[in-house]
Amino acid sequence: MYTNNAYLNNSTIDRKDKSKPLVITMCGTYKLYTRPKLPTWRPRGRLDFQLLYIAAGKAHFHFDNNDEATIVHAGHMVLYRPKEPQKYEYYAKDQTEVYWVHFTGNNVTNLLRSYGLTNKKVFHCGSGAEYQNLFCSMIKELQMCQDGYEEMLEIYLRQIFIRLQRHFKSSLNSDNSHAFEEIDNAISYFCEHYNEPINIDAVSYT
């Protein structure tokens, strides 16, 4: 198993920090090769937020203390909020690659809402190197702790949020475009066959 993790002040302690609007406390990545299983079980959740990005393979999540797993495939993100139970597993057979970040702050809920991250737990975000690059940049910043690293961490995480927001809007526009195209096709059909008996089922397949 490959791991590359970073922690604010080298501390793995769960924390809630209300001193700033957004604070990144830890981030990292896991890639399973030979280790059969990597489970996580936090019955009481955590005090902070956690965002996970499934970059490859898939992961098994148990939401709302459900024994039955929800399979989350590559190209999706999972968002845990404070005190939400966290139970999930990665399996080597799934060739799972995941990136994660924990964050807190005094304005996180409003910030997430402004980017379209509502009360859903699983978000489709698409695949590509952009997300991996941003997570890797956060890991490096938190490991090196150079001047201004806390601000850089916030900038990288906000870029992830912005990319998610753009993906949500482009997906919505795509769905709307498809719907408008179907409406146009139906109107054309009615105009061409106005003097004939109309079969609604036939129209739906034109």
Which residue ranges define each predicted feature?
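Generic protein-terminus/edge-of-domain signal
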Residues: 1-71, 92, 115, 119-122
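Conserved metal-binding segment of the jelly-roll/cupin
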Residues: 72-85
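Ligand-binding loop in jelly-roll beta-barrel domains
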Residues: 83-107
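Amphipathic alpha-helical segments enriched in hydrophobic/aromatic residues interleaved with Lys/Arg
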Residues: 110-175, 188
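Short helix/strand-capping hinge loops at secondary-structure junctions
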Residues: 193-197
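Conserved small/polar residues in nucleotide/adenosyl-binding loops
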Residues: 205-206
